[in-house]
């Protein structure tokens, strides 16, 4: 968030904070072989620093730029090496749960592979096998779209257009898909809304990335038309589900199937209530989803599809809500920016204030980061 704060304000205190902490603390994340988070951790640090250099916001020092780019090359390759194979011949980047596990979140980490590929890097495997990071990105996107996103096609009793499963579980003996699952959501058959938001933002971002790739590079992977159609379908389905299952102000409750929602009447027809007694909202999900809606709206409008207006307006509605109380922190003593975020409701990791029955009033790092990122994105669209 510090680097984005500098981007937004020009306050060099935040630049120094972000740059020094990246250099001092992030090397272990570049080579971390046990997580699915490279796109979150490294693109938001080394990636933003590289972008600021290329935009002329920082003095151009070739060695400094090479340092950031080396980190991004390595990060994308390390992430791509955490690989599982399915029975249908495709693959996926495994979650930190293990080789059986595909998280919906990881679609946002594909930007680590995308940047590494754009920088001309490949993953070197056994016997010096040279592995395309673009190929692994597309395979992961296909597998996630097939097993984590639902399209109302009767895959199970609760299959509706745009539902998202947090996790897809595979049998590692033969690679066959076994079941949807969740860890931070309520049920495998409901939708954890932050996971939904990762799908929304991840696929729309990768659609933009495809615009930078030559047709010849996509032809061996199925071709541009097929790949774009797959990603656009997942993006539209998830964004439609978000709009349909979120209160009128654009801030969702933490899971669409959370049991306490049944006691809240027509909760979708009014603004979300972070101070209710039944289920918490997750403003961090809204901050992430906001960007997905705005990006999808722009993508469609740029192609002459008027349906993009609905998504653009929905994204602006979400952003307008988050930049006001009760979501925007106004107490100078509070360390966060975006209030009423949730980390892990099932495990009880979220603070419940005295006199309250549910978590409220706190911020999380990814909520703050994505709020600032969404605001910067919207300001660039308006420029």
Predicted regions span which residues?
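Glycan-recognition and catalytic cores of secretory/periplasmic carbohydrate-active enzymes
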Residues: 1-383
